């Protein structure tokens, strides 16, 4: 019985994480990225100015280990060189979904 309950919990956890990734709004993420991220990163085709020492969003999306879920968690607590924006979980998920939409 305990193993059966454990299996059900695992299935529900996977399903809820998948549905939250599917619920992310890449269009809203693009808007947020252009507003908050474009001063450092190239966030869209045709963008002319960004910092040269940071990856473009397209290059992040092309990484073999790219994961929208991992990126969204990272955005909630970024590395020290990156400004700390007050992103909600939804906003972080939306930006990550936008970056994921840039995958070839």
UniProtKB/Swiss-Prot annotation:
Which locations, inside or outside the cell, does it occupy? Periplasm
**Gene Ontology biological process:** nitrogen fixation
Q: Which Pfam families match?
A: Cytochrome_CBB3
The positions annotated for binding heme c are 37, 40-41, 82
The record's similarity note reads:
Belongs to the cytochrome c family.
Q: How does it assemble?
A: Monoheme monomer. Has the tendency to dimerize.
Q: Does the keyword Iron apply?
A: yes
GO CC, alphabetical:
periplasmic space
Q: Which coarse location class applies to the principal site listed for this UniProt protein?
A: periplasm
Q: How is it modified after translation?
A: Binds 1 heme c group covalently per subunit.
* Annotated GO MF terms: electron transfer activity; heme binding; metal ion binding
Under what name is this protein listed? Cytochrome c-552
Q: List the disulfide bonds.
A: none
**Segment forming the signal sequence:** 1-23
Q: Which InterPro entries match?
A: Cyt_c-like_dom, Cyt_c-like_dom_sf
Gene name, per UniProt, is: cycB
Give the keywords, sorted: Electron transport, Heme, Iron, Metal-binding, Nitrogen fixation, Periplasm, Signal, Transport
Show the PROSITE patterns listed in the entry.
Answer: CYTC (PS51007)
Organism, scientific name? Bradyrhizobium diazoefficiens (strain JCM 10833 / BCRC 13528 / IAM 13628 / NBRC 14792 / USDA 110)
What superkingdom heads the lineage? Bacteria
Describe what happens upon changing residue 68 to P: In strain: CC705 / UW505
């Amino acid at each position: 019985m305990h193993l059966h309950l454990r299996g059900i919990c695992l299935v529900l956890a996977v399903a809820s994480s998948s549905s939250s990734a599917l619920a992310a709004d890449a269009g809203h993420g693009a808007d947020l990225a252009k507003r908050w991220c474009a001063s450092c990163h190239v966030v869209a085709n045709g963008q002319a100015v960004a910092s040269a020492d940071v990856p473009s969003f397209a290059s992040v999306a092309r990484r073999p280990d790219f994961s929208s879920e991992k990126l969204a968690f990272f955005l909630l607590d970024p590395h020290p060189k990156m400004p700390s924006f007050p992103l909600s979980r939804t906003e972080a998920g939306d930006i990550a979904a936008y970056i994921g939409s840039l995958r070839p």
